[in-house]
């Protein structure tokens, strides 16, 4: 990453930051102006956690069976804010060492609505002005991350499985309180069609026209839109474009819309399947790269039928 995508004048002529996933616990840095490189060490919040090397999938001609993928942080995706800080999806602790505030019985508003358990990757931030890295312990899992254009510089994330998580970066930078600054919400379809979030049936239950329905729509891509909604992609077959409208209190008001790629009567993809990378433009059009080798666009405004209710479960648009 080299700039804030909301304002690409940020960090002009500055350094470029990368991510190494399981290879090493540092951010590789390129300074194209000085023709130099650097490394920014990253580390878990828990000093007693050093991860575990991943077994080699096959014998390497060079490394043999040596387990070289041994990073503790597994940094996947960097993103830059308006002040040039680099925010990353990075492991802060053992995935199974779940903080109490994440779990059932916590007074955290997100946990009261939908408690969470194990999560494999969290957040972190590097501030070039102070040369300081800070791991951020989140309840929700992370994979990709993207800033909304709001007063809180809300950082939305994918990779949370049954929930989508966010961090109020303004609050976190002011207080350092990761627990208070974060939140998450499950994916709830408005299947009773009344326009608000109500009690819901679980993913393995049939639709009840009097209730809403929770779905396990883990996001791969995540993209906040200009209207305050948050979009993402789902990798399953045939895959889907997912739209979450947070509402006044996302813990309890967020509603999800789920738009699958079209199937024929035999359940075969008509053209293309399984969205991966995705972004949303200023007109609310979703642009996607598909695992089938296609590119695609989705224009919600062209949907003909209702966008909520008992039939709005994927193949309705």
Name each model feature, range by range.
Residues 1-13, 67-83, 144-152, 209-227, ...:
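Structural signature of eukaryotic scaffold interfaces centered on beta-propeller domains
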Residues 10, 16-22, 81, 86-95, ...:
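Conserved beta-strand positions in repeat-built beta-propeller and related beta-rich domains
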Residues 78, 114, 118-126, 152, ...:
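Ligand-binding pocket scaffold of soluble enzyme catalytic domains
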